[in-house]
């Protein structure tokens, strides 16, 4: 088990790819030549992303070999886990999976002074925080879906908490545009509650690594409608949802240009 952070990870750009729908934005990013120093995968993505650098499977892997608790993932994980070459961080070693490494739970909690980690994605984010990476790009970490308002997976708050800790430490955080993490998939005009009800809402967005705050009309005047990683070159428009869960089709995005 690691006792200290990995020096080689300090300042690196890392993609964390989980199993939600916004994993598609990772594939789009790779298609459009975006590069990462390391790619970390969550659970079943270990059988989807070729040659990941690290994996996080925080449940004991015995559940894949000795039960069907993982549902449809079971057969694939049983087949893939023994063949993986990269480190797989987990809570318990198992001879059937040679690549397993114990997650550095004690040194990480002591260094970050936080023991609030309630899902596997949060463990990966905490690992990035502990290792002082330079940038995190989140894909597939989707805990609720607009198409099913009565279903939500546990863990979104914990992930957002750890992302905030990362940002406080100067780590750049980017979220896939299809993900609801940090409200990434909410229309720009609806992100600031209360102001979203105004005829010309106040918005905030990132430009030249600095947060800008202005009226939405000012963005339109400057032809500065921000765009995300995916859908920049797609023929199919992205569907966005406002705070009332009403779908709206965004107009064709344009590349930002300086005034």
PLM segments and residue spans:
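Metal-ion/cofactor- or nucleotide/acyl-coenzyme-handling active-site neighborhoods
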Residues: 1-259
């Amino acid at each position: 088990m690691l006792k200290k952070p990995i020096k080689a990870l300090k300042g690196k750009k890392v993609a964390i790819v989980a199993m939600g729908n916004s994993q598609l934005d990772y594939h789009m990013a790779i298609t459009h030549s975006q590069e990462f120093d390391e790619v970390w995968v969550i659970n079943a993505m270990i059988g989807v992303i070729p040659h990941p650098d690290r994996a996080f499977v925080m449940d004991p892997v015995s559940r894949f070999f000795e039960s069907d608790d993982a549902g449809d993932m079971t057969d694939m994980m049983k087949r893939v886990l023994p063949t993986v070459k990269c480190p797989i961080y987990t809570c318990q070693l198992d001879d059937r999976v040679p690549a397993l490494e114990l997650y550095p739970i004690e040194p990480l909690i002591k260094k970050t002074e936080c023991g609030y980690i309630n899902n596997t994605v949060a463990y990966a984010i905490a690992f990035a925080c502990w290792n002082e990476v330079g940038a995190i790009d989140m894909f597939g970490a989707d805990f609720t879906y607009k198409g099913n308002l009565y279903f939500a997976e546990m863990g979104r708050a914990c992930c957002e908490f750890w992302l905030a800790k990362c940002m406080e430490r100067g780590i750049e955080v980017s979220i896939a545009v299809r993900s609801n993490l940090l409200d990434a998939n909410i229309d720009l005009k609806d992100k600031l509650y209360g102001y979203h009800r105004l005829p010309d809402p106040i918005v905030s967005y990132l430009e030249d690594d600095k947060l800008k705050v202005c009226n939405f009309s000012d963005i339109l005047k400057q032809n500065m409608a921000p765009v995300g990683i995916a859908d920049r070159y797609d023929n199919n428009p992205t569907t966005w949802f406002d705070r009332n869960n009403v779908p709206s089709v965004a107009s064709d995005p344009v590349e930002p240009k300086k005034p």
